[in-house]
Regions:
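PAPS-dependent sulfation machinery
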Residues: 90-192
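Conserved phosphate-donor/acceptor-positioning beta-strand/loop module used by diverse small-molecule
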Residues: 195-196, 206-231
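N-terminal signal-anchor transmembrane helix
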Residues: 40-62, 93-95, 100-101
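Post-Walker A helix-loop "phosphate-sensing" segment adjacent to the P-loop in P-loop NTPases
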Residues: 79-89
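PAPS-dependent sulfotransferases, especially Golgi type II membrane carbohydrate sulfotransferases
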Residues: 1-45, 50-51, 157-163, 168, ...
């Protein structure tokens, strides 16, 4: 964030920062000052070219709830040399990456752990990354504001339903989204593949902004999604907190956001033109990656499958030693997920687990 955005977000949340997170706030203030300065330099050097940039083609959007396999699919599609994705550096420094990435990406790599804390997936400046981080940083309008302020929640500015945003917020969000994509187009000049879990609830907005866009919806066993989402909030997004988080509130957030986003998706999926939506299961992508990708390319009428697969196969071979986290599902969790997310078990062919006995747990990875 720039200083102006950070101050605005702090004001919305009554500057309620837990004392233990004051060093984190101090870091954000210093970083905000640096972002503000570099953003001015980028505007002076590249501003006119960025404003004139045009998208090569409508974007391809990967849809799916958090921990549903969107990152894996994003990484696979990034193997296609005719496509491009936002990188981690671009998503985390959206105000100035056009200007700063030639030298800033190396500095970023020197300070990153190399792996994401919630799943050990590689994280470097050049790895594909979701654009929601960039949108949160550019305008402070994103569900990810809940990660910064888990107690106050940032009000309606963190809504997953665009219709619930405060007046003027959607237009501001759209302007910043388009600016970010113009920067990507100016930098790379290829069709952009994007992935952001909240896009599940933005179908009508995205279609209005980008007629001709393609959508890929990936689902995963809801029990695994729930358990992995808990891990995400505990060990991934927790690094962003400026307030003390209530585990019960975060648990409810995971459950309710899933229901709300899928209600919005089911309502608006009919707006997507025929031939522009492809759906798959994460489990099928894991076991039959070539078949899934080949069908995806055919259904969405995308070129270059064979070239993409040559590189994707190399990427998959490098993942040979990767081990996913294992999670244990107990009865209380099974009951909540089975009841509240029942609609997706039936729709996508996942079996409901019968009640578990006391002390019994089921393992998921």
């Amino acid at each position: 964030m720039t200083l102006s955005t950070l101050f605005r977000v702090l004001l919305r949340n009554q500057a309620r920062v837990n004392w233990r997170y004051l060093p984190r706030l101090a870091f954000l203030l210093v970083l905000g000052g640096l972002n503000s300065y570099l953003a001015c330099l980028e505007q002076a050097v590249d501003g006119e070219d960025i404003a004139a940039a045009q998208l090569v083609a409508p974007p391809i959007f990967i849809l799916g709830y958090w921990r549903s396999g969107t990152t894996h699919l994003h990484n696979l599609l990034s193997c296609d040399p005719s496509l491009t994705c936002p990188t981690a550096y671009q998503a985390m420094f959206p105000h100035h990456f056009v200007y700063s990435q030639p030298w800033g990406a190396g500095i970023f790599n020197a300070f990153t752990p190399g792996k994401r804390p919630m799943d050990n997936v590689a994280l470097y400046g050049a790895t594909p990354h979701e654009e929601e981080m960039a949108l949160a940083a550019l305008c402070g309008i994103s569900p990810y504001m809940q990660a910064l302020f888990p107690a106050t929640g940032d009000g309606a500015y963190s809504a997953v339903d665009p219709a619930k945003l405060p007046p003027g917020a959607l237009a501001e969000w759209q302007a910043n989204f388009l600016l970010f994509l113009k920067k990507l187009s100016f930098s790379k000049g290829k069709r952009i593949v994007l992935k952001s879990p909240p896009h599940l609830g933005r179908i009508s907005v995205l279609l209005n902004m980008f007629p001709g866009a393609k959508f890929i919806h990936i689902v995963r066993n809801p029990y695994a999604v729930y358990l992995s989402s808990q891990k995400l909030w505990r060990s991934g997004l927790a690094y962003s907190h400026l307030q003390k988080a209530d585990p019960r509130r975060l648990e409810e957030l995971i459950l309710s956001w899933y229901m709300e986003l899928y209600a919005l998706f089911e309502r608006d999926r009919c707006l997507i033109p025929p031939g522009s939506l492809f759906e798959l299961r994460f489990e099928d992508l894991e076991t039959s990656p070539r078949e899934c990708l080949e069908t995806l390319y055919a259904e969405l009428d995308l070129p270059n499958f064979e070239l993409c697969w040559q590189r994707a196969a190399q990427y998959l071979r490098k993942l040979g030693g990767y081990k996913k986290n294992r999670h244990r599902l107990v009865e209380e969790e099974r009951a909540k997920v089975s009841q509240r997310w029942a609609f997706n078990f039936a729709r996508y062919g996942y079996p409901l687990i019968p009640p578990l006995g006391q002390g019994v747990a089921v393992s998921f990875s």
